[in-house]
């Protein structure tokens, strides 16, 4: 019961913030106008969230990305992340600083014998516009190391596969591995 009470209080706080004209983002403020009810008055806990219906993936495709930036975070750095775009126009989402907190907490779960503090890391993966590079880079820095990144472009890999250009695919794989070594 205590967890439910805390969850409901947190939901009310989040709804109040995101639907307040002073702090909310244009997307949710515009969405509120189409609902026919006021989320700040009628969402009183987690169970009420179903009133919004399903979140549509299509809302995340295309721009402008500023529609997702809350007014309450105006002036703060914004990071833009995208999906790989393999199912159409890439889905875009924004993040401010909270990914850093997420990965600092995640760092607590990493055993030091496998992720020694103060050691440098090598990341071979998509560098942008994905969250992964920033996440791994911050995690390495948080643990006292430096992250060296080798970019792997999954969109290019998928195009090579779809075209059946296996020779180019293997050449790209060799190129990426050579950079890592």
Question: Where are the language model's segments positioned?
Answer:
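Short, intrinsically disordered, charge-balanced linker/junction segments flanking boundaries
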Residues: 170-181
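Nucleotide 5′-phosphate-binding alpha/beta core
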Residues: 1-82, 88-120, 126-129, 137, ...
